[in-house]
Protein backbone atom coordinates (compact mmCIF):
# COMPACT_ATOMS: atom_id res chain seq x y z
CA UNK A 1 0.00 0.00 0.00
CA UNK A 2 1.32 3.45 -0.92
CA UNK A 3 1.60 5.82 2.03
CA UNK A 4 0.66 9.39 0.99
CA UNK A 5 2.31 10.65 4.20
CA UNK A 6 -0.64 12.79 5.24
CA UNK A 7 -1.00 11.61 8.83
CA UNK A 8 -1.45 14.57 11.20
CA UNK A 9 -1.31 17.07 8.34
CA UNK A 10 -3.81 19.87 8.84
CA UNK A 11 -6.21 20.42 5.97
CA UNK A 12 -8.50 23.41 5.49
CA UNK A 13 -11.30 22.65 3.02
CA UNK A 14 -13.88 25.19 1.87
CA UNK A 15 -17.31 24.36 0.48
CA UNK A 16 -17.30 21.17 2.49
CA UNK A 17 -20.83 20.72 3.80
CA UNK A 18 -21.81 18.54 0.83
CA UNK A 19 -20.61 17.09 -2.47
CA UNK A 20 -16.95 17.16 -3.40
CA UNK A 21 -15.85 19.13 -0.35
CA UNK A 22 -17.50 16.74 2.09
CA UNK A 23 -16.04 13.75 0.25
CA UNK A 24 -12.60 15.38 0.39
CA UNK A 25 -12.92 15.89 4.13
CA UNK A 26 -13.65 12.20 4.62
CA UNK A 27 -10.89 11.14 2.24
CA UNK A 28 -8.24 13.21 4.01
CA UNK A 29 -9.45 12.08 7.43
CA UNK A 30 -9.16 8.45 6.30
CA UNK A 31 -5.47 9.14 5.61
CA UNK A 32 -4.98 10.43 9.15
CA UNK A 33 -5.09 14.13 8.36
CA UNK A 34 -6.84 16.57 10.69
CA UNK A 35 -9.62 18.38 8.91
CA UNK A 36 -11.11 21.84 9.31
CA UNK A 37 -14.04 22.51 7.00
CA UNK A 38 -15.85 25.69 6.15
CA UNK A 39 -19.02 26.34 4.19
CA UNK A 40 -21.71 28.98 3.71
CA UNK A 41 -25.43 28.53 3.22
CA UNK A 42 -26.50 31.43 1.06
CA UNK A 43 -30.16 32.21 0.45
CA UNK A 44 -31.83 30.44 -2.46
CA UNK A 45 -35.08 30.90 -4.38
CA UNK A 46 -36.76 27.77 -3.09
CA UNK A 47 -39.01 27.38 -0.05
CA UNK A 48 -38.15 25.05 2.81
CA UNK A 49 -40.96 22.77 1.68
CA UNK A 50 -39.55 22.57 -1.87
CA UNK A 51 -36.07 21.81 -0.55
CA UNK A 52 -37.40 19.13 1.78
CA UNK A 53 -39.36 17.44 -1.00
CA UNK A 54 -36.28 17.41 -3.22
CA UNK A 55 -34.23 15.76 -0.46
CA UNK A 56 -36.91 13.16 0.12
CA UNK A 57 -37.29 12.31 -3.57
CA UNK A 58 -33.56 12.27 -4.28
CA UNK A 59 -34.27 13.20 -7.90
CA UNK A 60 -31.46 15.29 -9.34
CA UNK A 61 -31.98 18.85 -10.47
CA UNK A 62 -31.46 22.42 -9.32
CA UNK A 63 -33.76 22.08 -6.30
CA UNK A 64 -31.87 19.06 -4.95
CA UNK A 65 -28.54 20.79 -5.55
CA UNK A 66 -29.70 23.85 -3.59
CA UNK A 67 -31.06 21.57 -0.86
CA UNK A 68 -27.62 19.96 -0.55
CA UNK A 69 -26.06 23.42 -0.26
CA UNK A 70 -28.34 24.24 2.68
CA UNK A 71 -26.99 21.41 4.82
CA UNK A 72 -24.82 22.11 7.83
CA UNK A 73 -21.57 20.19 8.25
CA UNK A 74 -22.58 18.79 11.63
CA UNK A 75 -23.27 15.24 10.46
CA UNK A 76 -20.03 15.17 8.46
CA UNK A 77 -17.97 16.25 11.47
CA UNK A 78 -19.73 13.74 13.71
CA UNK A 79 -19.08 10.94 11.21
CA UNK A 80 -15.37 11.73 10.90
CA UNK A 81 -14.84 12.06 14.65
CA UNK A 82 -16.85 8.92 15.46
CA UNK A 83 -14.61 6.99 13.06
CA UNK A 84 -11.51 8.06 14.96
CA UNK A 85 -10.64 11.14 12.93
CA UNK A 86 -10.30 14.76 13.95
CA UNK A 87 -12.51 17.38 12.35
CA UNK A 88 -14.02 20.78 13.06
CA UNK A 89 -16.34 23.01 11.05
CA UNK A 90 -17.12 26.70 10.87
CA UNK A 91 -19.64 28.49 8.67
CA UNK A 92 -18.18 31.57 6.99
CA UNK A 93 -19.04 33.83 4.06
CA UNK A 94 -15.79 33.98 2.09
CA UNK A 95 -17.10 36.71 -0.20
CA UNK A 96 -16.26 38.99 2.75
CA UNK A 97 -12.44 39.19 2.73
CA UNK A 98 -12.34 40.08 6.43
CA UNK A 99 -13.60 36.57 7.27
CA UNK A 100 -10.59 34.85 5.72
CA UNK A 101 -7.91 35.65 8.35
CA UNK A 102 -10.50 34.89 11.04
CA UNK A 103 -11.01 31.47 9.46
CA UNK A 104 -7.29 30.71 9.53
CA UNK A 105 -7.09 31.96 13.13
CA UNK A 106 -9.86 29.58 14.16
CA UNK A 107 -8.29 26.64 12.35
CA UNK A 108 -4.97 27.32 14.05
CA UNK A 109 -6.69 27.55 17.43
CA UNK A 110 -8.53 24.24 16.95
CA UNK A 111 -5.93 22.20 15.07
CA UNK A 112 -2.78 24.17 14.26
CA UNK A 113 -1.32 25.87 11.16
CA UNK A 114 -2.71 24.85 7.78
CA UNK A 115 -0.50 22.47 5.78
CA UNK A 116 -2.94 21.77 2.95
CA UNK A 117 -5.42 24.28 1.57
CA UNK A 118 -8.29 22.95 -0.53
CA UNK A 119 -10.32 25.76 -2.08
CA UNK A 120 -13.55 24.13 -3.16
CA UNK A 121 -16.38 26.57 -2.43
CA UNK A 122 -18.46 27.82 -5.34
CA UNK A 123 -21.30 30.11 -6.32
CA UNK A 124 -23.33 29.39 -9.43
CA UNK A 125 -26.36 31.23 -10.77
CA UNK A 126 -27.00 30.84 -14.49
CA UNK A 127 -26.42 34.08 -16.38
CA UNK A 128 -26.52 34.97 -20.06
CA UNK A 129 -25.83 37.86 -22.43
CA UNK A 130 -28.72 36.79 -24.66
CA UNK A 131 -32.27 37.85 -23.66
CA UNK A 132 -33.73 34.97 -25.69
CA UNK A 133 -32.13 32.49 -23.28
CA UNK A 134 -33.69 33.96 -20.14
CA UNK A 135 -36.06 31.51 -18.44
CA UNK A 136 -37.55 30.67 -15.07
CA UNK A 137 -37.53 26.94 -15.78
CA UNK A 138 -35.32 24.72 -13.67
CA UNK A 139 -32.96 26.90 -11.71
CA UNK A 140 -33.62 29.77 -14.08
CA UNK A 141 -31.34 31.76 -16.37
CA UNK A 142 -31.07 35.49 -15.88
CA UNK A 143 -29.47 38.34 -17.76
CA UNK A 144 -25.96 39.09 -16.62
CA UNK A 145 -25.59 42.11 -14.38
CA UNK A 146 -22.98 44.02 -12.42
CA UNK A 147 -24.24 42.44 -9.22
CA UNK A 148 -24.19 38.93 -10.70
CA UNK A 149 -20.70 39.29 -12.12
CA UNK A 150 -19.37 40.77 -8.89
CA UNK A 151 -20.84 38.00 -6.74
CA UNK A 152 -19.45 35.20 -8.91
CA UNK A 153 -15.98 36.71 -8.94
CA UNK A 154 -16.05 37.63 -5.24
CA UNK A 155 -16.72 34.03 -4.25
CA UNK A 156 -15.21 31.93 -7.06
CA UNK A 157 -12.10 34.01 -7.81
CA UNK A 158 -11.25 36.67 -5.25
CA UNK A 159 -11.88 34.46 -2.23
CA UNK A 160 -9.67 31.71 -3.70
CA UNK A 161 -6.88 34.23 -4.32
CA UNK A 162 -7.11 35.80 -0.86
CA UNK A 163 -7.19 32.35 0.74
CA UNK A 164 -3.95 31.49 -1.09
CA UNK A 165 -2.37 34.80 -0.06
CA UNK A 166 -3.34 34.27 3.58
CA UNK A 167 -2.00 30.73 3.46
CA UNK A 168 1.37 31.86 2.09
CA UNK A 169 1.67 34.74 4.56
CA UNK A 170 1.27 32.40 7.52
CA UNK A 171 3.42 29.72 5.88
CA UNK A 172 6.33 32.16 5.59
CA UNK A 173 5.90 33.55 9.10
CA UNK A 174 6.31 30.12 10.62
CA UNK A 175 9.14 29.25 8.21
CA UNK A 176 7.42 26.12 6.97
CA UNK A 177 9.04 24.00 4.25
CA UNK A 178 6.17 21.87 2.91
CA UNK A 179 2.77 22.91 1.62
CA UNK A 180 -0.03 22.04 -0.78
CA UNK A 181 -2.77 24.11 -2.38
CA UNK A 182 -5.52 22.46 -4.41
CA UNK A 183 -8.12 24.58 -6.19
CA UNK A 184 -11.37 23.37 -7.72
CA UNK A 185 -12.34 24.62 -11.18
CA UNK A 186 -14.79 23.10 -13.67
CA UNK A 187 -14.57 21.43 -17.06
CA UNK A 188 -16.70 24.32 -18.39
CA UNK A 189 -14.25 27.06 -17.36
CA UNK A 190 -13.19 27.80 -20.94
CA UNK A 191 -16.77 28.73 -21.95
CA UNK A 192 -20.30 27.92 -20.83
CA UNK A 193 -23.37 29.15 -22.69
CA UNK A 194 -26.01 30.46 -20.27
CA UNK A 195 -23.60 30.13 -17.34
CA UNK A 196 -21.16 32.81 -18.35
CA UNK A 197 -20.13 34.40 -15.04
CA UNK A 198 -19.63 31.07 -13.31
CA UNK A 199 -17.39 29.83 -16.13
CA UNK A 200 -15.36 33.04 -16.33
CA UNK A 201 -14.83 33.20 -12.57
CA UNK A 202 -13.56 29.63 -12.56
CA UNK A 203 -11.27 30.33 -15.50
CA UNK A 204 -9.73 33.15 -13.48
CA UNK A 205 -8.88 30.71 -10.72
CA UNK A 206 -6.97 28.53 -13.16
CA UNK A 207 -4.79 31.53 -14.02
CA UNK A 208 -4.32 32.50 -10.37
CA UNK A 209 -3.34 28.92 -9.58
CA UNK A 210 -0.66 28.72 -12.26
CA UNK A 211 0.77 32.07 -11.19
CA UNK A 212 0.76 30.92 -7.57
CA UNK A 213 2.54 27.71 -8.55
CA UNK A 214 5.24 29.75 -10.25
CA UNK A 215 5.71 32.02 -7.27
CA UNK A 216 5.37 29.56 -4.39
CA UNK A 217 7.41 26.64 -5.66
CA UNK A 218 10.61 28.02 -4.18
CA UNK A 219 9.04 27.78 -0.74
CA UNK A 220 8.14 24.10 -1.09
CA UNK A 221 4.48 24.65 -1.96
CA UNK A 222 2.78 22.94 -4.88
CA UNK A 223 -0.37 24.44 -6.38
CA UNK A 224 -2.64 22.41 -8.63
CA UNK A 225 -6.16 22.59 -10.02
CA UNK A 226 -8.81 19.89 -10.15
CA UNK A 227 -11.31 20.23 -12.98
CA UNK A 228 -14.34 18.00 -12.31
CA UNK A 229 -16.41 16.72 -15.19
CA UNK A 230 -19.99 15.47 -14.73
CA UNK A 231 -20.14 14.74 -11.00
CA UNK A 232 -23.46 14.04 -9.31
CA UNK A 233 -23.64 16.57 -6.50
CA UNK A 234 -27.41 16.80 -6.86
CA UNK A 235 -27.71 19.00 -9.92
CA UNK A 236 -27.79 16.32 -12.64
CA UNK A 237 -31.32 15.41 -13.70
CA UNK A 238 -32.19 11.78 -14.61
CA UNK A 239 -32.04 12.59 -18.34
CA UNK A 240 -28.55 14.06 -17.85
CA UNK A 241 -27.39 10.95 -16.03
CA UNK A 242 -28.73 8.75 -18.82
CA UNK A 243 -26.89 10.76 -21.49
CA UNK A 244 -23.63 10.79 -19.54
CA UNK A 245 -23.78 7.07 -18.82
CA UNK A 246 -24.22 6.47 -22.55
CA UNK A 247 -21.62 8.90 -23.87
CA UNK A 248 -18.82 8.75 -21.29
CA UNK A 249 -16.03 6.24 -22.07
CA UNK A 250 -16.09 4.92 -18.51
CA UNK A 251 -19.84 4.54 -18.70
CA UNK A 252 -21.05 6.33 -15.60
CA UNK A 253 -21.57 9.66 -13.90
CA UNK A 254 -18.82 10.68 -11.51
CA UNK A 255 -19.22 10.68 -7.75
CA UNK A 256 -17.73 13.23 -5.33
CA UNK A 257 -15.32 10.56 -4.11
CA UNK A 258 -13.78 10.34 -7.59
CA UNK A 259 -12.62 13.94 -7.25
CA UNK A 260 -11.75 13.67 -3.56
CA UNK A 261 -9.31 10.83 -4.22
CA UNK A 262 -7.49 12.95 -6.80
CA UNK A 263 -7.26 15.77 -4.27
CA UNK A 264 -5.67 13.39 -1.78
CA UNK A 265 -3.18 12.31 -4.42
CA UNK A 266 -2.26 15.93 -5.24
CA UNK A 267 -1.60 16.54 -1.55
CA UNK A 268 0.44 13.36 -1.18
CA UNK A 269 4.18 12.88 -1.20
CA UNK A 270 3.75 10.97 -4.47
CA UNK A 271 2.66 14.23 -6.17
CA UNK A 272 5.74 16.16 -5.03
CA UNK A 273 6.83 16.83 -8.65
CA UNK A 274 3.46 18.14 -9.82
CA UNK A 275 2.66 21.83 -9.71
CA UNK A 276 0.78 24.32 -11.85
CA UNK A 277 -1.23 21.50 -13.41
CA UNK A 278 -4.93 21.19 -14.23
CA UNK A 279 -6.15 17.65 -13.63
CA UNK A 280 -9.38 16.81 -15.41
CA UNK A 281 -11.51 14.29 -13.49
CA UNK A 282 -14.41 13.36 -15.71
CA UNK A 283 -14.27 9.76 -16.89
CA UNK A 284 -13.30 10.89 -20.39
CA UNK A 285 -16.48 12.96 -20.87
CA UNK A 286 -14.16 15.58 -22.34
CA UNK A 287 -10.90 14.68 -24.06
CA UNK A 288 -8.46 17.54 -23.66
CA UNK A 289 -5.93 18.00 -26.44
Question: Where would I find each of the regions flagged by the language model?
Answer:
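Alpha-helical segment proximal to the catalytic Tyr-Lys
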Residues: 26, 169, 214-215, 272
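Short C-terminal tail/terminal secondary-structure segment
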Residues: 2, 246-250, 264, 275-289
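Catalytic loop of short-chain dehydrogenase/reductase
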Residues: 122-130, 136-148, 152, 161, ...
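The beta1-alpha1 cofactor-binding region of Rossmann-like NAD(H)/NADP(H)-dependent oxidoreductases
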Residues: 66-71, 91-103, 146, 257-258
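Short, small/polar-rich loop/turn modules that mediate ligand/substrate recognition or access, typified
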Residues: 217-222, 274-276
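Conserved glycine-rich Rossmann-like NAD(P)H-binding loop of the short-chain dehydrogenase/reductase
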Residues: 31-75
Amino acid sequence: MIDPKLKNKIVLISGANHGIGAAAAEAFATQGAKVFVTYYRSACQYSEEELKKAEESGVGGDVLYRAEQQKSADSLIEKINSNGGTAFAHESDLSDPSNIPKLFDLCEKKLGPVDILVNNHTYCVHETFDPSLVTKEGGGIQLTSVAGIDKHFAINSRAYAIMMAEYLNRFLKRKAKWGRIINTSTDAAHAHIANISYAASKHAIESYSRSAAGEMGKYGITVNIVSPGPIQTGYLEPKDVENINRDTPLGRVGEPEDVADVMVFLASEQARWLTGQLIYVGGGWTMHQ
